[in-house]
Structure formats: C-alpha cells, structure tokens
Amino acid sequence: MSDVAVAADTTETPAAPTKASKATKASKATKASKATKAKTTKVPMVKADAAHPPFINMVTEAISSIKDRKGPSRAAILKYITTKYTLGDQANKINAHLRKALNKGLESNAFVQASGNGANGRFRLAEKTASVAKSPAAAKKDATGEKKATTTVAKKAATGEKKATTTVAKKAATGEKKATTTVAKKAAAGDKAKKTEVKVKKVKSPKKIAKSPVNKVTKSPVKKIAKSSSMKAAPKKAAAKPAKKAPAAAPEA
C-alpha cells in the first residue's frame, strides 16, 4: 500500500450532527441576536428646525410692520410673509395656513377686523398685542442692545467713580495743601503784623503840633480927633529968663 492510502485510512470521518446539537446552536444564535439588539440604543429622531416661525407670529409681525391707515389686507400680509420667509412653493397650503391664522387671531382677540368679514378684509392689532408684537430678530437686537448698554453704563459708571474719587482725592489734597499754606501764610503775616504793631507802640512818634493860622492884626484906622473950637490951645509957657550974672569983682590995687 502506498503512503497516500495509509493517510486516507488514518483520518477519522466526522460524526453526523445530532438534533440536540442543532437546537443548542439555534438557541445560542437567538440569544446573541437579542444581546446585539439590546446593545444597539435607539437613536432619537432629530426634528429639523422650521424654516419659518408659526403663521400666527408671522401674521402679527406683518400687521405691525405694514403701515396702512385702514390696516393691511390679506394679500398684503401674504406678500410680506412670502418675501421675508421661505414658505415653499405650495401656494394652496400657504393660503390655508394664513386663513387659519387670521381666524385664530380674530377668535383670540389678538387681531381686530377693520373691514370685511372673516379672513377677507383688513386687519389691525389689538392694543395688548400691538405693544407685545415684535419680530424675534428685533427682540434679539433689543436684548443685545440692552446688554451692551448695561455693560457700557456699568463700565462708564465704574470709570466715572474711579475718576471722581481720584479727582476728589486730588482736589482734597490740593485743598488741604492750599489751606495749610494759606493758613501758614496768614499766621506768619499775622505774627509780622503783631510784631510791627508792638514795635510801633514802643517807639512813640513825636506829635506834630498843628500850627494854628496866625491871626493877622488888622490895623484899625486911627480916628482923628477933631479939634473942637471949645478946646483952646494951652498957653505956651514963657521962656525962662536968663539968670543975671553976678557983678565982676573989683580988681585989687
């Protein structure tokens, strides 16, 4: 016999699978499939964002933005919302939603019908909704504007307080310096003035005698006494007679 024949004889033929082995395999397969199903978590369906807000909001925005004395008509509202938002090409559905929104607004007293009946006519906003109705973009802008305003006001207030405190401190410091310098100067000047006053009191300056104006003696005119005729001139005294000379002595013999 050849080597190939011996090898063929030595290999054992596999045993035929029994029914029990088939059942165990099937049960294992089902359990594995259930485990895989349990492991796979269900992915939640993510709803796509709507391309436009609800029709009632769009209608209120259109009525508030369209400026018409009589109020905007349904055609004007439709034109506004179709130009601003992407509503698609199905005009019948758009008109149906618009009519429903108008009727709903009239029932809830959000809109006031200026003229016409039902969805056909002109509309105005009620007083309550007119003050509340704003576009979402405008509301966001208002919110951002308020935030910016508050931040800028807070920053300005903080800087203003810092500047005010620094300026007040500087002014107070300068005021104190000025006050001290002025007080010191005034005190020094006061001391000097007191010293000078004391010196002046010690040294008595001679009093100047005010010269009284000399009374000019007015010469009174001498009154000439008129010689009255009664007054006679006093008699002149007789001239003294010369004394008689003594007789000369006779010569001696």
Curated annotation (Swiss-Prot):
What SUPFAM superfamilies does the record tag this protein with?
Winged helix' DNA-binding domain (SSF46785)
Q: Where is this region: Disordered?
A: 1-43, 134-253
Q: SMART domains per the record?
A: H15
Q: Name one Pfam family in it.
A: Linker_histone
Q: Which GO terms describe its molecular function?
A: double-stranded DNA binding; nucleosomal DNA binding; structural constituent of chromatin
Name the predominant localization.
nucleus
Query: Key word Amino-acid biosynthesis present in the record?
Result: no
User: Where do Basic and acidic residues bias regions lie?
Assistant: 139-149, 188-200
Residue stretches making up the H15 domain = 51-127
Per the record, where are the segments of Basic residues compositional bias? Answer: 201-210, 234-244
At what positions is N-acetylserine found?
S2
User: What CDD domains does the entry give?
Assistant: H15
Biological process terms from the Gene Ontology for this record are: chromosome condensation; negative regulation of DNA recombination; nucleosome assembly
Listed GO cellular component terms? nucleosome; nucleus
Source domain of life: Eukaryota
Q: Which Gene3D superfamilies match?
A: Winged helix-like DNA-binding domain superfamily/Winged helix DNA-binding domain (1.10.10.10)
Q: Where in the cell is it found?
A: Nucleus; Chromosome
Q: Which PANTHER family match?
A: HISTONE 24-RELATED, HISTONE H1
Q: What is this protein called?
A: Histone H1.4
Natural source organism: Caenorhabditis elegans
